């Protein structure tokens, strides 16, 4: 830690306080995440250290780079590249009645998918994607932050400040207590973020797990074994759930064209096995008119 100076506290993440800091010799500005662990006495679990070390290998222009992992007084600090704005804050700055430019929505979604495909191809899930951990710069680049931390530290039910961790972007298989889940959980989250990019409003903003499920069911219909094999045997599925009929996504998300709504509907398919993959999503006709040559991941490929 002696290599870094804390400049100021910039926020409170899922796992602890985040500081803006500076490397004493290089002058590079960084984000320093102090990880607060449930069992303070026992120190940092070796599994967490192992998981985190793997994340240092994830180098991609749309992933926030983990530069260093440091220990001080049995506290773990993760040193990340610094970006000053997250997507939630950015959407909040857009004046009422105005929306994100359609080409920006498309570019952001494409870059988010490029980042997720990179991680999924390396068997790393995010599991907790939301606008707060999508960071942006002033050049139109968007990066995914906090990758893999859910696996290393678990997703707490409450942030250590006792604020409830948001359920708005969580997939139905996780909400219904499925023990076996995989890459489709991230695709669902990206689908809900896609809708929010277009409308500035969360698509499903439940205030409890059951409210979250019912908001999804009201929009997409209550799932059953016909549309999602074995859903009725998931731990938290109840036969007493109200049986809502599927509605039209277009009524909830009005700023998307036909291709956009088609892609969104494929990202929000109940059955994880049928949900579109990140790789397939990148090839969807929605992106046909996007100039991909200027995107950061594509610029690197040229060299």
Curated annotation (Swiss-Prot):
Ranges where the Protein kinase domain occurs: 4-287
Keyword hit for Nucleotide-binding: yes
Phosphotyrosine, modified sites: 15
Activity regulation (record text): Thr-14 and Tyr-15 are phosphorylated maximally during G2 phase, but dephosphorylated abruptly at the G2/M transition. Phosphorylation at Thr-14 and Tyr-15 inactivates the enzyme. During M phase it is also phosphorylated on Thr-161. Finally during G1 phase it is phosphorylated on Ser-277.
One Gene Ontology MF term: ATP binding
Chain sites annotated for binding ATP: 10-18, 33
Source organism superkingdom: Eukaryota
Name of the protein: Cyclin-dependent kinase 1
Organism: Gallus gallus (Chicken)
Gene expressing this chain: CDK1
